[in-house]
């Protein structure tokens, strides 16, 4: 491994981070797929840390904010997606502390409501399935459905 390899890997990583924020694990995987050695990757990750360019907590918070703005999701789904992105569980949990599951569930339900046809029971079942698929927990779903569909 040479300084040239480290410089190339660092430039590549900075390029990735210039496009969007990445988790530490995502950068590690991208560099590995590009053929860089584990030793080079670790040096690059350390350098990115010293430059404050790599922060899993910031990444997780921004991911949650972005994800829920476009497609409201529940805690289960967000936790799973953060794990897929390589964010450690303790950092994911810290980022999710600020998340308002009830508000997001209501938002997801309100977005879906105009597209539901049929009687109230049919709409309730469809909406329930939609919210489960979005990763919301059953208690939050029940509260949301009661709030929206109670006459």
Swiss-Prot record:
GO terms for biological process: regulation of DNA repair. Transmembrane segments: none annotated. Keywords: Cytoplasm. Its main location: cytoplasm. GO terms for cellular component: cytoplasm. It is found in: Cytoplasm. Modulates RecA activity. Belongs to the RecX family. This is Regulatory protein RecX. It comes from Prosthecochloris aestuarii (strain DSM 271 / SK 413). The lineage of its organism: Bacteria, Pseudomonadati, Chlorobiota, Chlorobiia, Chlorobiales.
